[in-house]
């Protein structure tokens, strides 16, 4: 569980940037062209954190450099999701295994400037022998966060204030991003740096 003990503090250390970027991303989710760039920026944030760099504030997600990689991003995501969905149709387990094998492909695409196919191949090689660790780290984080989220949302629902419940959901999504970005940065650093 070293990944959790390193990843969560890394996310907390960069809380303001990750939290602010996530809130900005949620606010721009309905703007198509802009949202693709901000989605790429949010998804590739662990690369900077893996290098022990701090993104220069939450507004970094609006930089043009993220929108210029839209083609590669869509090709990679299309290839990955087609294969993962196809594998999941037959059984859930193959879909999970393939998604774990390619979990580092997006980071490799943008960090090492590989082609989408090479990024998927490299990710498969880097995660070989580490899939259980990645799976259980994600599972433990999801269960732990789920328990905390259910407790907090339960309190707001008991109070009966719908507005506060909606605000709590948005804040919980952003807080989940803080932990998951830190965890993904540690996984990427250990496997690919």
Model-derived segments and spans:
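Interfacial aromatic "cap" segments that immediately flank transmembrane helices
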Residues: 1-27, 62-86, 98-149, 182-185, ...
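Selective recognition of hydrophobic, aromatic-rich stretches within alpha-helical transmembrane segments
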Residues: 26-55, 81-117, 121, 159-193
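Short amphipathic alpha-helical segments
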Residues: 35, 148, 152
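Membrane-helix interface linkers and caps
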Residues: 53, 59-64
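Juxtamembrane "helix-exit" motif on the non-cytosolic side of transmembrane helices
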Residues: 151-159
């Amino acid at each position: 569980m070293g990944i959790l003990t390193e990843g969560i503090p890394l996310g907390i250390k960069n809380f303001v940037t990750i939290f602010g970027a996530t809130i900005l991303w949620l606010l721009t989710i309905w703007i198509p062209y802009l949202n693709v760039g901000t989605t790429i920026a949010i998804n590739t944030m662990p690369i900077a954190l893996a290098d022990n760099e701090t993104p220069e504030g939450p507004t970094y997600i609006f930089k043009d450099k993220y929108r210029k990689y839209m083609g590669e991003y869509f090709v990679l995501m299309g290839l990955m999701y087609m294969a993962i969905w196809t594998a999941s149709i037959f059984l859930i387990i193959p879909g999970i295994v393939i998604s774990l094998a390619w979990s580092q492909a997006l980071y490799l695409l943008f960090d090492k400037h590989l082609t989408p196919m090479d990024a998927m191949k490299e990710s498969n090689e880097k995660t070989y022998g580490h899939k259980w660790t990645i799976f259980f780290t994600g599972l433990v984080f999801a269960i732990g966060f789920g328990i905390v989220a259910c407790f907090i949302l339960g309190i707001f629902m008991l109070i009966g204030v719908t507005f506060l419940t909606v605000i709590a959901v948005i804040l919980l999504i952003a807080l989940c991003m803080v932990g998951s970005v830190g965890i993904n940065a540690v996984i990427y650093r250990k496997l690919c740096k």
